[in-house]
Amino acid sequence: ITSRTKAVIPVHLFGQCADMTAINGIAKRRGLRVIEDACQAIGAAQNGRRAGILADVGCFSFFPTKNLGGFGDGGLMTTDNDGLAEALAMLRVHGSRVRYLHEAVGINSRLDALQAAVLHVKLKYLDQWTEGRRRNADRYQRLFTEAQLLDRVILPVTTPGNFHVYNQYTVRVRQRDDLRNFLKEKGVGSEVYYPLPMHLQNCYRDLGYHKGSFPVSERAAEEVLSLPIYAELTEEQQAYVVQMIGEFYR
């Protein structure tokens, strides 16, 4: 945090809230705004309060891969500040309150009617899908424990006070890329979120970071692997996923 810092943007990664008590405390002492990146955390909560109301502004995504996904791109911002709400509403329509009169440089960020219609239908199923994902996460915990793979596979941990919605079920493993190729051969889908840390992205080269600047992030990027977690996943399918991972490490 420097004199140029205006806001802090914590990310509720994979469906679990960041430590908002600590982050909000730091921000308050420094006079900063806090913007929640809750794109992967719709329905998540911390100490009984939902993601999206834990800071000044909450940001959600309705990209099709999210727990509540549309038929294309879309999103939502939340705030209990009337002034911020008015400013955000203006920015989403080209910086305009009155048609063809622009008070600021804005963007075209309106949710189109098709996306709204799809989301309206799907919204009533969100809690059901969330419970399915949480059930499957608990089942993975049991299956990996029974398979005696906890020395090979580091499972996700839910921080006390958090309600995890498992947008992804992300484990950490050695030989990640080899394991992923093996699972693909066995018909098991997986994804890597994310393969390259932010400080090593080309767009940030001018900041002077290099490999070794953030070794914890770099190691995580080499080990993370997201396994199937969608609500309709059966116990037999999950058992097969775990069985194949066990077969790889034997």
What are these regions (language model features)?
Residues I1-G70, L76-T78:
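Active-site phosphate-binding strand-loop segment of PLP-dependent enzymes
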